[in-house]
């Protein structure tokens, strides 16, 4: 699961379990480090009104789509989220 890292009202990164585990591996004192030291700050932003196909290049890169309404963070979409959405549409 990915979590947004916010600075005020702005998304500045995302972090997931593997980011945290890789950051603290071998030194449990690193659990005290700021979240920003473990986050991914290169974000693939997609406009809220973009077609679903705009997600495909993001997922092809193995990234998470950061959904934006202008400059406002709305949410994030993972490949699994898209697969679950498509599965529900078929049922």
Residue spans for each PLM region:
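Short secondary-structure boundary/capping segments
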Residues: 27, 35-37, 56-57
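Bateman (tandem CBS) regulatory domains
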Residues: 31-43
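A glycine-centered beta-loop-beta connector
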Residues: 3-19, 59, 67-81
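The conserved cystathionine-beta-synthase
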Residues: 6-7, 24, 44-62, 68-69, ...
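Cyclic nucleotide-binding regulatory module and flanking cytosolic helices
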Residues: 21-26, 31
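Conserved protein kinase catalytic domain
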Residues: 21, 36-39, 83
């Amino acid at each position: 699961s990915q979590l947004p890292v916010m600075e005020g009202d702005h998304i500045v990164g995302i972090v997931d379990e593997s980011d945290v585990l890789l950051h603290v591996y071998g030194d449990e004192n690193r659990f005290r480090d700021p979240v920003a030291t473990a986050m991914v700050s290169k974000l693939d932003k997609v406009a809220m009104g973009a077609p679903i196909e705009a997600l495909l290049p993001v997922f092809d890169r193995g990234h998470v789509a950061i959904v934006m309404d202008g400059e406002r963070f709305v949410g994030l979409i993972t490949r699994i989220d898209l697969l679950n959405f498509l599965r529900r549409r078929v049922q």
